[in-house]
Amino acid sequence: MQICFLPPTTYTNFMNQFLKGSILLLTLINVSNTVFSQTKTTTKATQTTVANPVNLSYRFMLDAPSRREAADPNMLVFKGEYYLFASKSGGYFHSKDMIHWDLIKTNDLPLEDYAPAAVELNGAIYFMASGNAPLKVYRTTDPKSGKWEVFNSAFPITMIDPDFFVDTDGRLYFYYGCSNVNPLYAIELDPKTFNPIGTRVEVMNSKREIYGWERKGDYNEIMKDRPWIEGSWTTKHNGKYYLQYSGPGTEFKSYSDAVYVADKPLGPFTLARHNPISYKPEGFVTSAGHSNTYQDKYGNYWHVSTMTISQKHMFERRLGIFPTFFDKDGDMYVYTGFGDFPYKMPTKKISSPAELATGWMLLSYNKPVEVSSEQPNHPKNLAVNEDIRSFWSAKTGNKGEWISIDLEKTSTVNAVQINYYENESKTMGRGEGIYYQYLLEYSTDNKTWKTLEDKRNNTTDVPHDYIELKTPVKARYIRLTNYKVPDGTFALAGLRVFGKAPGVAPAQTNNLTIKRNEADRVMVDLTWDKQAGATGYNIRYGIAKDKLYQNYQVLGNNALTIRSLNANQKYYFTIDTFNETGVTKGTKIIEVN
């Protein structure tokens, strides 16, 4: 979690002010006694798919400008259910299936301190957040109740971005750090007290000269500034310790996670061959940094990540969940290909990303739009341009404002994602009346309309509402009519329609050419022929022909510069082509030394 840009000499003063501010903000929060949020869900119980960003009740921040945030997630499974802790959420989230989420409120935890860490040990959950020593460690055996007790009242380490790791032998370790100067650290803790034992070690620091993903900027284009290295997380797999970290900064589309590997929990750590492991620089919602890796009830690995909007404020962020794998050689990778399209939530052990694919394609990209009204700086086309950082806004938030998309072909519609944006909002924190009400309809002729989803009586906060249709419909037009917004205008960062259009998938793309920059080998330039009928392209690349784990989506264009390579690594590239009917995989793989 990137707090601010401070030289080392001001760190102590910063931490003191950070804590004072946290205490002040806590006094502003008026939450009920530690109970589930009493909002009635209207989500269909038959839902089996999801789409990023996760459709959580993201809390409005307590200071201006009015905006929502959640970041620095920590997910764990406790007694077969999921608990998700994230910065500035006014509580923590609970789910039985990773599809439907409830908010648990509590007065017992320091919810205004950034980057919460939570771990299960001996039948209890332990919690701590960033801050200045002495810090408190909290414990509960009943997280659903929201009741926590202080377990350790004087944890002695001042730090940001804590991470607890319990080894298979029961020993407890602590990783931390968030700096554009200092390294990440690790130390062993006494599992009976959570106090440090042994000697602190430095585990890694930036080498942005040769690791392009550590360079700042949306496209890793800024070399001169040191990155923020932060967000430690450790996973043990087949006897190896995978130390994950994030950089170069939470506000960038390039925000990602990379990994070092060791034979012991305190290292020494060596950079893994495949990096970054979690990377999503393009698409509707981007970045996949400051994450944690966990296993679901079936043994599948997942990576829950911070994703950027960062328009009203640098810390305007959302969360995404991505499937994660370890291959036969122990190489770890997070699958972010089509990472904001719908995917299946498994109910069994899986072995590849292909098992989660729905086959539903994006039908709404850059399609003709009609609206009831629009603001000059937020025109209607921004509802379908696949960019969460821009938005269409009606002139008001009144009942009856509407938007309609012409898909241009009568297509099979399987799902719709409604991504609201908080335009002209004044809301702060949590409170009554924070929910959306709407009517979603479809038509084949723009005259006769039928209901897709009726949420005119909804009282659930659904800022990124995802509607999976139990029975697909044939539609050419999709219309969304506003009945209520919490505050401000009726505004959408994206009205996204998924399914399949008639026709065939595009042909393979030809003449992929790749040129590596020998003066700065973290960079590579790609060009290819535009393919008729293609919506976009997916560049897959990696460290071997059978390890093309990276995914870079391109819409419309036929050229790309990637600046996130390891200067010392050989790479292999191919290109897939997609449209509203399907994906055509590239078969020619090009080696780049």
Describe the role of every protein-language-model region.
Residues 39-224, 236-283, 298, 306-351:
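Beta-rich carbohydrate-recognition and catalytic domains
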Residues 185-197, 351-385:
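Predominantly extracellular/luminal regions of secreted and cell-surface proteins
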Residues 387-453, 463-510, 518-519, 529, ...:
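Aromatic, loop-rich ligand-recognition surfaces of beta-strand-rich domains
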Residues 435, 531-548:
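Solvent-exposed loop/turn segments flanking beta-strands in beta-repeat/beta-sandwich domains
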Residues 456-459, 551-557:
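Short beta-strand segments within Ig-like beta-sandwich modules, predominantly Fibronectin type-III
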Residues 522-534:
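Conserved aromatic anchor
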Residues 562-583:
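Beta-strand-rich modules
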Residues 579-593:
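Extracellular fibronectin type III
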